[in-house]
Amino acid sequence: MAILSAAFFDYPQDDLFVIAYTGTKGKTTASYFTEAILNEARPRHIALFSTIDTVVGPEPDQRFKSNLTTPESLDLFRDMREAVENGMTHLVMEVSSQAYLRNRVFGLTYDVGFFLNITPDHIGPNEHPTFANYLHNKLQLLVNARKVVINAETEHFDQVYAAATTTTYPESIYLFASAGFRPKRDDIDIDFRFDSQEADVAESRFTLVPVTEKAAALNIGGHYSLA
């Protein structure tokens, strides 16, 4: 159904820069943060498919409550096409393990895929039969992303990183971790470090530092890009 839906709506994903998040926890929060950041840079051009809201255009009536974290295939590609027709250039979306288990996003490639974390959850008669099945379906996002960003502190990191390397070159895989984290293996580098500065009920402050050369580089020529 996913392949047919993509073809029926004339492959709308090709007209969008697609950023996808997966993880047991944090997908919705991260998606909303990303949407907000992108909207500062490119107002009224950012679509969102999240557990809470679906945004397919800049007008109030083009924002509505979601039924699923990741829509069924027909709804997904229809909403993508509508977003394109409404002038959206970027899409931030949550991708659940159920979306892969049910083949809702089969064949969809993401420009950037984020893997936040994995813990035993969503395992049962109506979800995943085993944790191995749950992890396998989570990892499919990495296999289908052009660039990958991984939380280096996640459980089962070795399996997560190995999945990313099956289809993505190392220079397109980025790792992030807290300031004090030290990886257990010496063949990887942490690209971004973050450090919490202050947190209260009103706001949180933190620093994010690019550590490696590739993390500090922009694929855009010109000194003006650094301003």
Regions found by a protein language model. Name each.
Residues 3-170:
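Phosphate-binding loop of NTP-binding sites
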